[in-house]
Amino acid sequence: MNHFLEHNKTKIDTLCKNHKVKSLYAFGSVLTPKFNENSDIDLIVDFKQQDILEYASNYFNLKFALQAIFNREIDLLEEKAVKNPSFLEHINSKKQLIYAD
């Protein structure tokens, strides 16, 4: 795991538990030597079953809390919302687990 993510692992775990996250993965530049102070962080999340209002609240609160922790833009994709099979295959081939419940 990237040291930038690992350094904040306890905070990430707490956020994921509080926002009913089933799994959270990183992908993209955060996992490569290209990651720098200007890079955003690409994450893909799968939430536990919940009603739509609770889901929306958990999604946005998680995204904003992660942005506050990392002090940078977070590109948070919802796993079920990725419809492009090629893009999903690319993500799945590169992603790294950050949290699982």
Per-region residue spans from a language model:
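Short hydrophobic/aromatic beta-strand micro-patches
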Residues: 44-46
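Catalytic core of pol beta-like nucleotidyltransferases
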Residues: 1-25, 31-37, 50-101
